[in-house]
Amino acid sequence: MKRYFPLLLLLVFFLDACKPKPPISSAQKDRQLIDYVNPFIGTGGHGHTYPGATMPFGMMQLSPDTRLDGWDGCSGYHYSDNEIFGFSHTHLSGTGVSDYGDILLMPTNKVVFNNGADGKDGYKSKFSHDKEIAEPGFYKVHLEDTNIDVELTVSERSGIQKYQFADGSKQVIILDLEHRDEVLDSKLTINSKTEISGHRFSKAWATDQKLFFDMLFSKPFTKVTFLDGKTEGKKVKAAFEFDNTTGNEISVTVGISPVDEEGAIHNWQLEIGSKSFEQVKKEAQEIWEKQLEKIVIEGDNFDYKTNFYTSMYHTMIAPNLYQDVDGRYRGMDLKIHETKDFDYYTVFSLWDTYRAAHPLYTIIEQDRTNDFINTFLTKYDEGGIMPIWDLSACYTGCMIGYHAVPVIADAYLKGIRGYDVDKAFEAMKHSATRDKLGLDSYKQFGFIPVEKESESVSKTLEYAYDDWTIAQMAKSLGKDNDYKIYLERAQNYKNVFDPSSLFMRGRFRNTWFAPFDPYEVNFNYTEANSWQYSFYVPQDVSGFIKLLGGKDKLEGQLDKLFVAENNTSGRHQVDITGLIGQYAHGNEPSHHMAYLYNFVNKPHKTQEKVRQILTELYTNTPDGISGNEDCGQMSAWYILSSLGFYSVTPASNQYIIGSPLFKRASINLENGKTFTIVADSVSDKNKYIKSVQLNGKNHPYSYINHKDIVAGGDLIFEMTDKPTSWGTDNKHIPVTEIKEHLIVSTPFIAKGEIAFKGSTEVTLKSVDSSSKIYYSLDDNEYKLYEGPFMISEKSDLKVYGEKDGEKSAVVTTTFYKIDPNVKIELKTEY
């Protein structure tokens, strides 16, 4: 019997192992999730968010205004202020440029049209944060100077302001249509003693914004006074007086519309109608609770959970609905259109949000992602281009790239296809083939020369990534010629890489921009310096590694990035914030960098840096966001990273694994499935990954695929306090690599004076030392470059590279001979 006992024991273990594992339980709420949202996060520092009431992706943002201008007043509110000018119905969240603040109302005790910003008597009032409350869908504050309590709540296109006046005080409501933006035209119509309507057309970031409104007072006004007696024009203000013997409370129901006054009326009638303030608030908060339940987390740290759900909230207040309840909207041609098939949106901050916010939406907002893309294509029909940064039917001309393209490609390759795919691909190619914003030079040379366009390095790099996403969609559609064209363009990053410095650097047609300082903020980069753009090759990290000279070189450059001095030189750039060395988390070009360590077999360094950013650069305080929140992008980084992964390369269908922050998190998908993430033993100390299991199987890979998430299941991390060997094998690291249709990079002049006295010696080089260089002087026959040569007269030098029968673009540079008696002195810091 003894000799059979080990066999029986082994059989028992085997049978036990064969039993189906119990499913991993989903994360559970321990309270209302809206209780974890702190809308004041981001209202201080440079976050540029607002605390007022709004609905998920809603048209109305009903919020207090404490600032009339200034960079830190972009949202209309800053936590450091102690005076309120009033409560307006539209606001931007986290942007770096001001706009909105439309249709200001302010309850007060006297008829006064001056806002008080000039220090003279006005309708503004002091307030204290001790008597201020902000929740999803609700805001309340006490106005100290007039002893009035104000409460705000909203539906999607309408809202209610409720004022509680003190006993016996005079009851006055000021309507200011001149507030903040330059007014192009405005009008106020008195329909009855309880209803008024009108419009305001204004100019700021949006150069021709049109907004209509309709207001219903809960009791009739007894008198109305107009500034200078005017009800039309650029300075329309009105004061409405009410009988204070008929109760201390006045509510104002407001509907807004980009279409017309009828639209504004229908919007509030259908959304609010006869509902009470409390009913509207309750409905708003129930909708917010349902939205936040898309991801449920468990953890012991209250601040971390507050940061998470506030981040969820911030990713859901833009883009904004831009059509009335009847489907009508104002298009990019400023004409009125109608759609019944999808919701039409505005406020697409795509240079920011294509990186993480839109990838997050492909997980938790797939239906809305279809609406976003249908909106892009409709704007393409109306205005001739897809949005870059659109605002209220206006093109702002702000930011770079054509980042509607990766949003579409990412969605399409993830199976989100509720739109006209052929039109989408046509619009994507149209974005890439225009001759504006440096694209003409980019197509001709394979890069944008400094002398041709500002922000040339950033544009070259971002265009190259966008082109890669077009190539991926072309490949999926079987469009081989387009695939080749755009895959070649995706490699144009090679033409702005300087092998001597290992940085991405501005170049004239044939020569590098000099002198070069990677710390310098100048016109070659977008809101950044070379440190902050030199790692931007998400589409071909392997190719970038080859340029640098190997994985150890990329690792070394990343190490230097995070320990470099955190000062910049050159132009002062307010956007460069949240610095760890030269890593600038407060601005988007840095957002993928910490995850690049996974590509060089050092995932523990990604885990260290990601956890540092999560816990140091996001806090439960008004200044708890380290830069402009940027319409959800800063928050989306936090959400994805705290779950344990990030979208380094949208359209690759991969998320790179970092360091999960919570014990358990469940993503409740629109398809009815749940994906649960468990981090066993996670703590502030235990930030390193020991092992990972995906659906019960060992997962040695330092990335996860999108299909694994949307299929439902579980991802289990075992965390520890020391770096491990997990994810370090070459077979298990993420790879993005362009392997076919390889280009020949454009040669450059490594030595030689473009303007010279006597003569100059010219040395040519290429990023690829194995390619051949050919040159021609003054249209003579091309010669193989074999070494430095002299130029002693004015000459036109043409060069190109060649390898394996492929040629680079031909680039021409004119050399000028200077009179030796002429002296040139440059007096510029650039």
Where are these regions (language model features)?
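C-terminal motif of bacterial Sec signal peptides marking the signal peptidase cleavage site
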Residues: 15-17
